[in-house]
Swiss-Prot record:
One of its GO terms (molecular function) is zinc ion binding. This is EC protein I/II. Binds 5 molecules of zinc. May have a role in Zn(2+) homeostasis during embryogenesis. Keywords: Metal-binding, Metal-thiolate cluster, Zinc. Belongs to the metallothionein superfamily. Type 15 family. It comes from the Eukaryota.
Length: 81
């Protein structure tokens, strides 16, 4: 998985320490577990407007997290598809 705004990384990813998405693999069959440097899972919404505990609808669903009603950051703005 590449770095993106959902993980708090610069887009496009500059590489090196500027990119905070890291992957830890524990075997090829185990798949890939991706986290940000701050400990958040990539794909979740780290923006300051916060999260809702339960997705309020399919449009706001983002993996295991969801964007709050007041969210308008880049991660949430693309959640309308």
């Amino acid at each position: 998985m590449g770095c993106d705004d959902k993980c708090g990384c610069a887009v496009p990813c500059p590489g090196g320490t500027g990119c905070r998405c890291t992957s830890a693999r524990s075997g090829a069959a185990a798949g890939e577990h991706t986290t940000c440097g701050c400990g958040e899972h990539c794909g979740c919404n780290p923006c300051a407007c916060g999260r809702e505990g339960t997705p309020s609808g399919r449009a706001n669903r983002r993996a295991n997290c969801s964007c709050g009603a007041a969210c308008n950051c880049a991660s949430c703005g693309s959640a309308t598809a």
